[in-house]
């Protein structure tokens, strides 16, 4: 299955890395590597994530996985998996939609 990454995700990860690097460059690199490794896991096992509909009060076909302090939101298509957003796990996910 192919992997697509929303351009917003790439930009957000860049900002996330810069923010974390202000305190700890090594941790910033490690965090971003872990997130990209999670993307690869999702690509290989697209149904590994939980259904987001179980955490929110509206219908959605998004799935999510936790990666440290972050939540990766994605959708599974017929030929691809698309990463839509990576958010802080303490952020109110419902405000994204």
Name the predicted role of every residue range.
Residues 19, 36-39, 45, 62-64, ...:
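Aromatic side chains
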Residues 49-79:
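Basic/aromatic recognition patch in beta-strand/loop cores that engages polyanionic ligands
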Residues 2-55:
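Basic, Lys/Arg-enriched alpha-helical interface segments
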Residues 12, 29-36, 60, 65-67, ...:
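A general secondary-structure boundary signal
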Residues 15, 26-27, 54, 64, ...:
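Low-complexity, compositionally biased segments
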Residues 67-97:
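Enriched for short, Lys/Arg-rich terminal
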Residues 48, 61, 89-93:
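Glycine-rich, flexible loop/turn motifs
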């Amino acid at each position: 299955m192919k992997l697509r990454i929303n351009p917003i995700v790439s930009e957000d990860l860049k900002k996330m890395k810069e923010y974390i690097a202000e305190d700890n460059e090594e941790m910033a690199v490690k965090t971003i590597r872990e997130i990209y490794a999670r993307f690869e896991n999702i690509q290989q096992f697209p149904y590994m994530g939980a259904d987001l509909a179980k955490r929110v009060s509206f219908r959605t076909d998004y799935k999510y996985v936790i990666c440290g302090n972050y939540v990766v939101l994605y959708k599974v298509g017929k030929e691809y998996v698309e990463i839509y957003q990576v958010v802080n796990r303490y952020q109110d996910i419902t405000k994204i939609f």
